[in-house]
């Protein structure tokens, strides 16, 4: 992660042109004592957006955050024909917007590249998307929780696409595995879909809510045994 995705570049004997343009390396392969650096986050983010029908062509894109993932998202958006890419920062520099200014940006797509909303700070949301009419998609690269507060608010607002970053995480790892093994994995899209589905089953919980004596504990223990999951009773915690 940042800052290591940038710092590691000075130790690489070869840097893939895409990684060099982005300014970040997330995959390093030792080939006969020489370190080769690549960026698979680009492919992972592109896969995530393609899988959910996020179309950058002709759109104004608002990127929250200024770290290495910002550069990756910016590269994908520009390569796919975004008409304008705007950056939002808590401490805006030249050419950047503050969060207070973001609502008036006229953006159709918002991408969060900050840790805001990541576990354990799951209730954090830096941007009030309810004041942004015309939004078509909200993408959050955070994958834990599977739906951040930003994604949940986007769903509540009826924005057509509201998605977290789990598929990006899996996809970039699938492409990285290809570099580690010396050849691309067969059908990376299918591999990504399969692994993502398995991870979602592991990550998502079953929550039982009801009045005292309704049978939550009994049903919960039975479900936990059948699903091979840990049972948690908040009355006992």
Regions found by a protein language model. Give the residues of each.
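Rossmann-like adenosine-cofactor binding region
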Residues: 95-162
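NAD(P)-binding Rossmann-fold cofactor-contacting core
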Residues: 79-97, 235
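Conserved lysine of the Walker
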Residues: 216
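Glycine-rich adenosine-cofactor-binding loop
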Residues: 37-42, 49-50, 54, 58-78, ...
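Adenosine-phosphate binding glycine-rich loop
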Residues: 141-203
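Short beta-strand-centered segment that lines the nucleotide-binding/catalytic pocket of NTP-utilizing
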Residues: 229-237
